[in-house]
Structure formats: C-alpha cells, structure tokens
Amino acid sequence: MSQVILDLQIACADSQGLPTEADFQHWLEAVLPQFQEVSEVTIRVVDEAESHELNLTYRGKDKPTNVLSFPFEAPPEIELPLLGDLIICRQVVEQEAVEQEKALLAHWAHMVVHGSLHLLGYDHIVDDEAEEMESIETEIMQSLGYPDPYISEKDPE
C-alpha cells in the first residue's frame, strides 16, 4: 500500500484561509502513489519575501513565484523515501487565482500537483515535456474534481 508522509510548515504571518493539512495530504495522495510506494514531502507555505529570496538564490529570478520544488537527492547507497520540498507562496497563489479567474482552492491544488511532478522529475522547459506534464496535471486535477488548470474557468469550452 502506498504511503505519503507530509510535513506541513506554515511560515507566513496569517494562516487564516489556507487549505487544511488534510487538503494538502489529499492532493499529494492524488499524485505520488502513482509513481512510488512511499513518499515523504515537506510543503512550506511562505510569504512573498521568503519566496522572493529563494527564487533569487536558486533560480536567479528577482521576484516571488508561486511554487518552488527542491528534489531530495540521496547518495546512491542510501535509500530514503524523502522526495523533496515544495515552497508555495501564499500571496502569489492568491493573486494568480484572481488574475486567472480560478477558484482559489483549485489553484492551491494545482500548485501542489505541479510542484509534486517537478519533484518526480517532470519539467516544462521543452515543449514535448511541457505537453506531457500538463496532460498529467490535467488528468490528476480532474480526478480530484477540479477543472483543467490551463483553461480559465470563464473561458468558453
């Protein structure tokens, strides 16, 4: 049986209105068991200042971002279920949901799904890989009862 272990860290001043730990767990469980038996993930919800600092340090981008993924790389002789860390910026997620006309909870779910796929090695730099990743994201989001994250909820179908 697959197991997903979540370490949730809330590092922003106001935790009011954030998804629950059960929400984050549910979203991880929709992704990870498809790929590996046991997974341990840390999700850290941060403010814009911390996101900005990490994005600048690790990606050279001078702005906060929605989600950063840091895969854990164990030495080959050590087997650990640690998959890595997701850093999600509350303000950016909330702002994007408004701008993209998406339900806030659906956008949070998408950030967890998207970041988890990065931890598993998926990327969207090359077009073919982007299409594959987006297809997997859409399928997982729909299995969770959310719409296609790449279509605005107000777009005609």
From Swiss-Prot:
It is an enzyme of class 3 (hydrolase). Belongs to the endoribonuclease YbeY family. It is found in: Cytoplasm. Single strand-specific metallo-endoribonuclease involved in late-stage 70S ribosome quality control and in maturation of the 3' terminus of the 16S rRNA. Coiled coil: none annotated. InterPro entries: MetalPrtase_cat_dom_sf_prd (IPR023091), YbeY (IPR002036), YbeY_CS (IPR020549). GO terms for molecular function: metalloendopeptidase activity; RNA endonuclease activity; zinc ion binding. Zn(2+) binds at H114, H118, H124. HAMAP family: Endoribonucl_YbeY. The keyword Metal-binding applies. The keyword Transport does not apply. GO terms for biological process: rRNA processing. It comes from Yersinia enterocolitica serotype O:8 / biotype 1B (strain NCTC 13174 / 8081). GO terms for cellular component: cytoplasm. This is Endoribonuclease YbeY. The gene is ybeY. Its cofactor is Zn(2+).
